[in-house]
Amino acid sequence: QELQANLPAERCCDVVICAPYPLIGALEAAGQCCALGVGAQDVSEHQHGAYTGEVSAEQLSDLGAQYCIVGHSERRSYHGETDLQVNAKTKILLENHIIPIICVGESLAQREHDLTETYVAYQVAAAFSGLTAEQAVRCVIAYEPLWAIGTGNTATSAQAQEVCASIRATLAKLYDANTAKAISILY
């Protein structure tokens, strides 16, 4: 009821909440009244098998998740998640009809050494490796600069726009301009 009361009936954008696993089902039920997208905060890179503690894309789909975050900076730094794992998770999510929200971003040192575009382009290319254009347009990219997480700092509008334009240029090189334009990029 609180969600419904606080979301405008007509919106110009999609609203998605990515919740911890135990809350996905309840959020999915609550979100039906107000066109709320429901997602998970992570997924296993493995489709099947005995991976204790892991939640598969198939399980997320059964819970009603429509989206899932992959490559979040906390997963990369605390759990050593690699670009190869982000790519594997992206592919598994797409196979299970879940929209991947692919996080990319640079550290403060990379920004200070003018490596932002190079590093972010590498992350994007790695995440989209092996994806067709049809698969790519089903993905969302979230620019998430590491230097802005939990620090109280935020990217300026100009900085965010510059990196988002660079991401779109990378996508155009990987695919084409129309495909790049069709992929949502968030900050």
Question: Model-found features: residue ranges?
Answer:
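Active-site loop-to-helix "anion-binding N-cap" substructures in soluble metabolic enzymes
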Residues: Q1-Y187
